[in-house]
């Protein structure tokens, strides 16, 4: 066995993998100690940004990911090139941003003809001739069920629920509940006026003290609406009219 083969064998050794995870865990949790980052067993992290109180459960893998406050990632989920908002719940074995293959015009879907990443060990391409990855944007207060798959380039609005096993291939509007393969809108969580209210107040940007003191109001949207008045469109129009005269 040559030197390169021995190195590859060493890197695949369970003890080496465990040591690498432990060193990374200690390093990141110390560096982000002011953010209370919690890293589970054998979590893999590369080029990520964290908010407050993020939790990464066992076996999760994150590459080029940014997480908002209080967002957690379930067991064995894989996220790449993804921006995630605040208060997002991602279940186990969710797949986000695993890359694309061409399905039009290109004679072959194989990356050996268009990619320089070497997925098949060698490549015929002298340049990256196809955009293999595109950023996924996930809003705030989103729940993604177990084993859901989200395609590259998709934008998920605030308040969305994605059912377990769904395959999301296109953008999802705020507060929609989607499911199926491919995912389709099943219903909305709230009435249109209530959605407009939530998008206006952006409660996820409130400070933690306010959220803690008012957490019981989150049990019923009508209770929250009673204490947080939002001017309707006619009121805003009247106010603008007065300013202009």
Regions found by a protein language model. Name each.
Residues 166, 170, 174-176, 184:
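Glycine-centered loop/turn positions within well-structured domains
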Residues 1-141, 148, 183, 192-245:
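Domain-scale signature associated with acetyltransferase and cell-envelope carbohydrate enzymes
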Residues 100-101, 172, 188-189:
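Conserved catalytic-core motifs of eukaryotic protein kinase domains, centered on the activation segment
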Residues 150-157, 166-169:
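Beta-rich strand-turn-strand
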């Amino acid at each position: 066995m040559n030197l390169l083969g021995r190195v590859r064998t060493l890197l695949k050794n369970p003890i080496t993998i465990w040591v690498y995870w432990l060193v990374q865990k200690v390093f990141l949790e110390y560096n982000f100690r002011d953010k209370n980052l919690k890293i589970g067993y054998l979590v893999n992290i590369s080029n990520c940004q964290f908010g407050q109180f993020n939790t990464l459960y066992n076996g999760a893998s994150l590459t080029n990911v940014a997480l908002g406050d209080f967002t957690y990632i379930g067991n064995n989920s894989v996220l790449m090139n993804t921006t995630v908002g605040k208060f997002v719940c991602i279940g186990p074995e969710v797949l986000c941003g695993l890359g694309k293959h061409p399905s039009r015009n290109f004679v072959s879907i194989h990356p050996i003809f268009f990619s320089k990443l070497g997925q098949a060990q060698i490549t015929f391409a002298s340049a990256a001739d196809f955009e293999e990855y595109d950023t996924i944007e996930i809003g705030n207060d989103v729940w993604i069920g177990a084993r859901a798959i989200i395609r590259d380039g998709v934008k998920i609005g605030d308040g969305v629920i994605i059912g377990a096993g769904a395959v999301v291939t296109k953008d999802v509007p705020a507060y929609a509940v989607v499911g199926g393969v491919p995912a389709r809108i099943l219903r909305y969580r709230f009435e249109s006026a209530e959605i407009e209210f939530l998008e206006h107040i952006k409660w996820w940007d409130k400070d933690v003290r306010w959220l803690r003191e008012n957490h019981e109001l989150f049990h019923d949207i009508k209770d929250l609406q009673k204490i947080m008045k939002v001017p309707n469109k006619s009121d805003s129009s009247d106010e603008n009219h007065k300013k202009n005269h």
